């Protein structure tokens, strides 16, 4: 009889779902090189490219969003749900799945339902402080529930507890966390050389993700003169938003302060502007303070790296991003400011003062590190593999 393990992982749509999934998949492969690992996703999410690039097989189904109001989509939901669940059953059968691992999102829900109907053990990971509908469904049947937060609002079945394991980190961030723990100064110097910044001076990194954060961009750029009195700046604006930021910086501090990133730009001005940085781990390696949104992935990565941050939650939905940042703020690992309050006056009144107090920044960083978790991918992978050998319940 073959001892090959058969694992199916589910999730996708956004990088927030795909990256943790791939982090766990990579560790499973390291622990079980001969394992058959497949991923269920959609043909339209980021997983379409990222999963095959990572060397894993992608099986696609259609998104089946849960209906939230009585409309045409709600009427069509039962038939679509039945069809996609049947597709998933076929996928699980073909791959001889011994365990299913879901990371939330529309893709996960029919996978949970199909696995439950087939008696296949289920593990789930919830990255947000407030769980989504798919994982709330899966939690009813799961044998193992890992989460980035202690109380994400899941109701497990009897005998199962929600375990705060942290967020499985992208390989680049996991490597950086290890390097910082080993030698923070050397890691900072090496990264600074690649970016063209001075490793011996404070650095603020502003990022709103790949799409940017317009209000954050404007408030910070309009305060450039005040920030540059205390630190260098790397401002990652988001696609198509760098021209406006450069204009605002020029008004605040003059064109001469503007610069670009890279080893050939060492003599540039101290306010470096770019739409995006592929190797954001390099910026994190040099940073003394981050100004950012508070998506679950961002918060988990920054705390894993021990980086103090000013979190400006995206003002949408039910305030999910605020819930993500709150535990870190409670642990004194950073500050949180409402988007509407994050104005140029707020920046000028608070950020220079913080930059002028390295002891406070250091305390924030130490508290962030203490709150952060760096081994989530390993813990999840081992717990998933253990479910295969566990007697059926």
UniProtKB/Swiss-Prot annotation:
Keywords annotated in UniProt: Cell cycle, Cell division, Cell membrane, Cell shape, Cell wall biogenesis/degradation, Glycosyltransferase, Membrane, Peptidoglycan synthesis, Transferase
UniProt KW Cell membrane keyword: yes
Pfam family, one: Glyco_transf_28
InterPro entries in the cross-refs: GlcNAc_MurG, Glyco_trans_28_C, GlycoTrans_28_N
One of the GO BP terms on file: cell division
Enzyme class: transferase
Record-listed UDP-N-acetyl-alpha-D-glucosamine binding positions: 14-16, 128, 170, 210, 321
Pathway(s) this gene product operates in, as recorded in its UniProt entry: Cell wall biogenesis; peptidoglycan biosynthesis
GO cellular component: plasma membrane
Molecular functions (GO terms): UDP-N-acetyl-D-glucosamine:N-acetylmuramoyl-L-alanyl-D-glutamyl-meso-2,6-diaminopimelyl-D-alanyl-D-alanine-diphosphoundecaprenol 4-beta-N-acetylglucosaminlytransferase activity; undecaprenyldiphospho-muramoylpentapeptide beta-N-acetylglucosaminyltransferase activity
Catalytic activity as recorded in UniProt: di-trans,octa-cis-undecaprenyl diphospho-N-acetyl-alpha-D-muramoyl-L-alanyl-D-glutamyl-meso-2,6-diaminopimeloyl-D-alanyl-D-alanine + UDP-N-acetyl-alpha-D-glucosamine = di-trans,octa-cis-undecaprenyl diphospho-[N-acetyl-alpha-D-glucosaminyl-(1->4)]-N-acetyl-alpha-D-muramoyl-L-alanyl-D-glutamyl-meso-2,6-diaminopimeloyl-D-alanyl-D-alanine + UDP + H(+)
Compartments where located: Cell membrane
Function: Cell wall formation. Catalyzes the transfer of a GlcNAc subunit on undecaprenyl-pyrophosphoryl-MurNAc-pentapeptide (lipid intermediate I) to form undecaprenyl-pyrophosphoryl-MurNAc-(pentapeptide)GlcNAc (lipid intermediate II).
Family: Belongs to the glycosyltransferase 28 family. MurG subfamily.
Protein name as annotated: UDP-N-acetylglucosamine--N-acetylmuramyl-(pentapeptide) pyrophosphoryl-undecaprenol N-acetylglucosamine transferase
Source lineage: Bacteria, Bacillati, Actinomycetota, Actinomycetes, Bifidobacteriales
Gene: murG
């Amino acid at each position: 009889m073959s001892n090959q393990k058969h694992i199916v992982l589910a999730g996708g749509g956004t990088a927030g779902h795909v990256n943790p999934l791939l982090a766990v998949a990579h560790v499973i492969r390291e622990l079980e090189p001969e394992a058959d690992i497949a991923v269920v996703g959609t043909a339209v999410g980021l997983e379409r490219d990222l999963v095959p690039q990572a060397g894993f097989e992608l099986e696609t189904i259609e998104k089946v969003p849960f209906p939230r109001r009585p409309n045409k989509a709600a009427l069509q939901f039962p038939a679509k749900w039945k069809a996609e669940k049947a597709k998933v059953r076929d996928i699980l059968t073909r791959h001889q799945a011994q365990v299913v691992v879901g990371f939330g999102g529309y893709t996960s829900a029919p996978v949970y339902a199909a696995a439950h109907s087939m008696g296949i053990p289920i593990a789930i990971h919830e990255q947000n402080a407030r769980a989504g509908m798919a994982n709330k469904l899966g939690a009813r049947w799961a044998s193992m529930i890992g989460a980035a937060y202690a109380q994400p609002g899941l109701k497990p079945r009897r005998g199962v507890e929600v375990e705060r394991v942290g967020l499985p980190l992208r390989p680049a961030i996991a490597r950086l966390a290890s390097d910082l723990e080993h030698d923070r100064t050397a890691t900072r110097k090496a990264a600074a050389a690649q970016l063209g910044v001075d490793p011996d001076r404070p650095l603020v990194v502003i990022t709103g993700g790949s799409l940017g954060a317009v209000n954050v961009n404007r408030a910070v750029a309009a305060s450039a003169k005040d920030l540059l009195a205390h630190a260098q700046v790397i401002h990652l604006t988001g696609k198509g938003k760098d021209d406006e930021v450069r204009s605002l910086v020029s008004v605040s501090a003059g064109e001469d302060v503007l610069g670009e990133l890279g080893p050939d730009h060492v003599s540039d001005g101290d306010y470096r502007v770019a739409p995006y940085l592929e190797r954001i781990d390099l910026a994190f390696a040099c940073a003394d303070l981050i100004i950012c949104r508070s998506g679950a992935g961002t918060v988990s990565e920054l705390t894993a790296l021990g980086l103090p941050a000013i979190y400006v939650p995206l003002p949408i939905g039910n305030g999910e991003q605020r819930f993500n940042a709150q535990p870190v703020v409670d642990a004194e690992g950073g500050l949180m400011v409402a988007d509407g309050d994050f104005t140029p006056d707020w920046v000028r009144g608070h950020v220079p003062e913080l930059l002028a107090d390295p002891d406070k920044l250091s305390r924030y960083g130490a508290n962030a590190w203490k709150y952060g978790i760096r081994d989530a991918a390993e813990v999840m992978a081992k717990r998933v593999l253990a479910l295969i050998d566990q007697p059926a319940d």
